[in-house]
């Protein structure tokens, strides 16, 4: 009888990372997806990264995940977002050649050790004594396994909406999964509906680019993956246009025909990626909205007009596009649509992403209420790691808010749940100064090495980089100038007669790496990424010291367990409202309790005192 350690259902961004992570840990893994071209499919925009999202990609790469490496082999337009602000909120982003991205992903996965791929449809999951036993395919056959990672994306009872037209689909032209939705309902999971959308696709050959604004990428693309030296994929430009008053009039006149505004859609859409209908209604005083014209490939004339996601009827979509500068004669290749799908309340899962109800069943991606390729991939790699570690009877791998954006996301989901598609932002992290894109590998790769999910190749790269960091730091500490000489160069420092090292100078707000290289040309030979890392660490040194103290407090509270049988109503010094909230959420630690909305610092102090008195008294009896 064929049996796998881990089976992953779904070959999207969560699924491929889960499958690869499980396989890297040496567990016999099966990835089941409908067809080969589904592997790593970019269902919506052809891009990876962005503000906070780019940091997620770097964290996935730090754990030897695939996304960063694959985008570096298929990225056609790189841009660092937010670069005029501090490094803590920089957002690496790259447009992808959609077909090339899938091709590279397919090549990697089909040659991955310990990984089999089956093109089939899963209809059900066989459970015995609240434990995963097998998956059941549409042809009735069973494949037995120890663990299942469910990464279904928008396919759970998915419905596409284009105006009044409503059709069952998990993605346009692809059938949804009713079987697995029924499985989850039968097992008693709390299920609700969410919605997302995508814009129409346009034939780039029919666009008048002279009426648009050119958007160039970075002159020197900065790779996502630590395994990538340089980006050798040809780079191309994007373009920007905008809606007009005529566009807005057409949308307002046809709002009753929009699936969103006619009451046809029940699910809540993503707050930070609204449809064009939402923009016109909620920002009614705004005269125009920007539209980014993003090429879908080097040899593909399809253009993705980022900013006009819609569920309006096809004929209305055609009409409104004609009112946009540069698109007056544009040909629509495919209409935009909204898609509604099932998701499970993420409070039904643990921080390992294993469900609380069923042992061996893990959820990752949009099934947990998130939106975005990067959020899905971040969950996928954690689910795959933990499923494989469980097969091997090893301790789970848990990332916290203090170590990663992935940890922030999982903690938010499992603690608070979500009623709208969850998207990662830098503002969600209280430790974002230390959780930057540039130091993701320094935060996570060592942790990955300890559990065995890092390949030997990356381990060598990482070890070499760490040595180079120490050598470069030593060099920067040895290169110094007197304050008088610095003053002659126009660099303002306190004239105390002391020598100032390059690391000292990095703390000056106006001083940067380029100036350091100009003063000491020997630095040209050093790795620029390492120089930038040390520059940022020096620049933020005083702030980071305070943040590390906060992190130490956080970590101490994270390990301060709250007994499962605690009765909050017996703590007289906290209000009834807080007692009810704590009883409902059942936080496992003091740290989790503190993060629940409405829980005051005074109530946390009261709980700590109560635990010390009650449980120390009981232990002394």
UniProtKB/Swiss-Prot annotation:
What range does the record give for the signal peptide?
A: none
Q: Flavoprotein: is it a keyword of this entry?
A: yes
Chain sites annotated for binding FAD: 10-15, 122, 177, 366
- What broad class describes the main subcellular location of this protein? cytoplasm
Q: Which Pfam families match?
A: GIDA, GIDA_C_1st, SAM_GIDA_C
Q: What does this protein do?
A: NAD-binding protein involved in the addition of a carboxymethylaminomethyl (cmnm) group at the wobble position (U34) of certain tRNAs, forming tRNA-cmnm(5)s(2)U34.
Q: How does it assemble?
A: Homodimer. Heterotetramer of two MnmE and two MnmG subunits.
Q: From the Swiss-Prot or TrEMBL record, give the protein name.
A: tRNA uridine 5-carboxymethylaminomethyl modification enzyme MnmG
């Amino acid at each position: 009888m064929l049996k796998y350690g881990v089976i992953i259902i779904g070959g999207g961004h969560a699924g491929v990372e889960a499958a690869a992570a499980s396989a890297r840990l040496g567990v016999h893994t099966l990835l089941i997806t409908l067809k080969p071209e589904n592997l790593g499919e970019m269902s919506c925009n052809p891009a990876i990264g962005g503000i906070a999202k780019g940091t997620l990609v770097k964290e996935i790469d730090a754990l030897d995940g695939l996304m960063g490496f694959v985008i570096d082999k298929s990225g056609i337009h790189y841009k660092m977002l937010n670069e005029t602000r501090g490094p803590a909120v920089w957002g690496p982003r790259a447009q992808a050649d959609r077909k090339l991205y899938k091709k590279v992903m397919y090549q990697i996965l089909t040659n991955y050790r310990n990984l089999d791929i089956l093109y089939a449809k899963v209809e059900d999951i066989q459970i015995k004594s609240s434990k995963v036993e097998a998956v059941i395919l549409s042809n009735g056959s069973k494949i037995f396994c120890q663990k299942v990672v469910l990464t279904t994306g928008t396919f759970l009872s998915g419905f596409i909406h284009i105006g009044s037209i409503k059709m069952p689909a998990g993605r346009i032209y692809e059938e949804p999964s009713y079987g697995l939705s029924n499985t989850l309902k039968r097992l008693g999971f709390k299920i609700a509906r969410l919605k997302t959308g995508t814009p129409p696709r346009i034939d780039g050959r029919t666009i008048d680019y002279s009426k648009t604004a050119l958007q160039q990428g970075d002159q020197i693309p900065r790779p996502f993956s630590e395994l990538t030296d340089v980006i050798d994929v040809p780079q191309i430009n994007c373009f920007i246009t905008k809606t007009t008053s005529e566009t807005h009039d057409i949308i307002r006149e046809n709002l009753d025909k929009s699936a969103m505004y006619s009451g046809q859609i029940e699910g809540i859409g993503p707050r930070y990626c609204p449809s064009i209908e939402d923009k016109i209604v909620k920002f009614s005083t705004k005269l125009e909205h920007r539209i980014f014209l993003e090429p879908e490939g080097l040899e593909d004339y399809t253009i993705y007009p980022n900013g006009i996601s819609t569920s309006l009827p096809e004929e209305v979509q055609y009409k409104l596009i004609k009112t946009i500068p540069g698109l007056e004669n544009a040909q629509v290749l495919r209409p935009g649509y909204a898609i509604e799908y099932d998701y499970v309340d993420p409070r039904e899962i643990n921080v390992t992403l294993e469900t609380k109800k069923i042992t061996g069943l893990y959820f990752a991606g949009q099934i947990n209420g998130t939106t975005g390729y990067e959020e899905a991939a971040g969950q996928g790699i954690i689910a795959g790691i933990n499923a494989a570690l469980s097969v091997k009877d090893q301790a789970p791998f848990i990332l916290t808010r203090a170590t990663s954006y992935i940890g922030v996301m999982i903690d938010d989901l499992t603690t608070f749940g979500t009623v709208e598609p969850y998207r990662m932002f830098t503002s969600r992290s209280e430790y974002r100064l230390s959780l930057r894109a540039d130091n993701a590998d320094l935060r996570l790769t060592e942790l990955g090495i300890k559990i065995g999910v890092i390949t030997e190749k990356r381990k060598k790269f990482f070890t070499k980089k760490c040595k180079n960091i120490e050598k470069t730091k030593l060099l920067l500490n040895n290169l110094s100038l007197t304050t008088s000489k610095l003053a002659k160069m126009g660099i303002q420092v306190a004239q105390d007669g002391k020598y100032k090292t390059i690391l000292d100078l990095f703390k000056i707000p106006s001083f940067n790496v380029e100036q350091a290289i100009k003063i000491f040309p020997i630095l040209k030979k050093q790795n620029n990424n390492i120089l930038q890392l040390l520059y940022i660490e020096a620049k933020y040194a005083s702030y980071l010291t305070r943040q590390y103290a906060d992190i130490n407090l956080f970590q101490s509270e994270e390990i301060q367990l709250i007994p499962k049988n605690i009765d909050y109503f017996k703590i007289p010094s906290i209000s009834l409202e807080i007692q009810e909230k704590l009883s409902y959420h059942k936080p496992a630690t003091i740290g989790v309790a503190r993060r629940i909305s409405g829980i005051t610092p005074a109530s946390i102090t009261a709980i700590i005192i109560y635990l010390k008195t009650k449980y120390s008294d009981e232990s002394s009896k």
